[in-house]
């Protein structure tokens, strides 16, 4: 079929398999250009491995350190009539490239919140990965979670706490600045958001792996978080999602203590704002990202997901000098350090106050934001012919759970 982008709200409903594959190849080349190191992770599990930061970290571990990787994700394959999800094509492209490079790659498609998935991962570690892993990356961004004990479905919300919040935002369909108001979360919504996006499931994973004795000496685990800046704090860090991220921080300290017996440890890694399917859904964030990208590009500080993942592994968790990673007072690895520089944020605040419909494209990097967003789904690549016939059915070596 011939596939062009179709967008609805903040999602793109079509995907391009060739474009997605080229996106993955581009990230692989970016990592390889930094050189391959041997003093890093050897056997890696990535929970949430098919897009965004999870995919980038899997690429960085495999192609930057030669690691064996097991990726867990929940994606839909394409059919004759309909393309699959971008994550399906990303995972397929990763698997193909890893195997071509002689690297071990295993993928499981299913519900990462389920006990069945944990059991399957443990089984594969024991039967195929030499019995132990030394890095567990937790990178799930999900709107809902089926509780493993009861089967109850909990949903996360992107809402402030206490009072409604109104701020500038972009209507990405009309390319216009609007005032978006979000009503506050209820107590139940806050609790459910913590259950979905907090540290509970991460802890279940690490406990299950520890009990099964599949964690190697000096095992590290890392979960991803975002704090942002005062522009986005009311909706994010001071909102329901912030409560979930605070729970993630508390979980990190518990897991760090738990892994001491192995000489290992746990951290939350706070990452920078990037264009992902997850961030596009957060009110005010696309406008802020369009501004901060403009400022950081002008200062030569811009990074995408793969640059952040490489810096996480190469300059934090696995430093060449063997020293422990620098952490903040909350025990977190900070990779939002460049974004939060005073000069960067001061420039962002000025633009935030000045931006209008008339100057949106001049003052911000909004044109590239839109391009980057469509690129997530395999579009807007100069090296892909989007009028050519393409097969939406891409098969690869994946275990369906």
Swiss-Prot record:
Involved in the final reduction of the elongation cycle of fatty acid synthesis (FAS II). Catalyzes the reduction of a carbon-carbon double bond in an enoyl moiety that is covalently linked to an acyl carrier protein (ACP). It catalyses: a 2,3-saturated acyl-[ACP] + NAD(+) = a (2E)-enoyl-[ACP] + NADH + H(+). Monomer. The active site is at 236 (proton donor). One of its GO terms (molecular function) is trans-2-enoyl-CoA reductase (NADH) activity. The gene is fabV. InterPro entries: Eno_Rdtase_FAD-bd_dom, Enoyl-CoA_Rdtase_cat_dom, FabV-like_NADH_b, Trans-2-enoyl-CoA_reductase. The record marks 75 as: Plays an important role in discriminating NADH against NADPH. Its EC number is 1.3.1.9. GO terms for biological process: fatty acid biosynthetic process. This is Enoyl-[acyl-carrier-protein] reductase [NADH]. Keywords: Fatty acid biosynthesis, Fatty acid metabolism, Lipid biosynthesis, Lipid metabolism, NAD, Oxidoreductase. Belongs to the TER reductase family. Pathway: Lipid metabolism; fatty acid biosynthesis. Substrate binds at residue 226. NAD(+) binds at residues 48-53, 74-75, 111-112, 140-141, 245, 274-276.
């Amino acid at each position: 079929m011939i596939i062009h982008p179709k967008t609805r709200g903040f999602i793109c409903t079509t995907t391009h398999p060739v474009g997605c594959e080229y996106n993955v190849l581009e990230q692989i080349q970016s990592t390889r250009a930094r050189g391959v190191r041997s003093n890093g992770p050897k056997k890696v599990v990535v929970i949430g491995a098919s897009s965004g930061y999870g995919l980038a970290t899997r690429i960085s571990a495999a192609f930057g350190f030669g690691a064996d990787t097991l990726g867990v994700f929940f994606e839909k394959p394409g059919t004759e009539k309909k393309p699959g999800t971008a994550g399906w094509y990303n995972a397929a492209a990763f698997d193909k490239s890893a195997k071509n490079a002689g690297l071990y790659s295993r993928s499981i498609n299913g519900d990462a919140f389920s006990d069945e998935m944990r059991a399957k991962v443990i089984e594969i570690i024991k039967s195929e990965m030499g019995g132990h892993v030394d890095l567990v990356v937790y990178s799930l961004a999900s709107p809902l979670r089926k509780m493993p004990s009861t089967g109850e479905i909990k949903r996360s919300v992107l809402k402030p706490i206490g009072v409604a919040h109104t701020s500038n935002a972009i209507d990405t369909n009309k390319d216009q600045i609007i005032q978006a108001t979000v009503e506050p979360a209820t107590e139940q919504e806050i609790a459910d958001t913590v259950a979905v996006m907090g540290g509970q499931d991460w802890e279940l994973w690490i406990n299950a792996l520890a009990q099964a004795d599949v964690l190697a000496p000096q095992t590290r685990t890392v979960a991803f978080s975002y704090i942002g800046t005062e522009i986005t704090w009311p909706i994010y860090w001071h909102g329901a999602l912030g409560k979930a991220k605070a729970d993630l921080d508390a979980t990190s300290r518990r897991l760090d203590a738990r892994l001491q017996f192995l000489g290992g440890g746990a951290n939350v890694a706070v990452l920078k704002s990037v264009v992902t399917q997850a961030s596009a859904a957060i009110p005010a964030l696309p406008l802020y990202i369009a501004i901060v990208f403009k400022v950081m590009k002008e200062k030569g500080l811009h990074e995408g997901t793969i640059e952040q993942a490489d810096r996480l592994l190469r300059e934090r968790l696995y430093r060449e000098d063997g020293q422990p990673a620098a952490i903040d007072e909350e025990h977190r690895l900070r990779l939002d350090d460049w974004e939060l520089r005073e000069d960067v944020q001061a420039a962002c605040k000025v633009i935030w106050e000045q931006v209008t419909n008339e100057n949106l494209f001049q003052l911000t990097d909004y044109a590239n934001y839109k391009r980057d967003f469509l690129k997530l789904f395999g579009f807007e690549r100069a090296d892909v012919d989007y009028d050519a016939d393409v097969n939406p059915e891409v098969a690869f070596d994946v275990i369906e759970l």
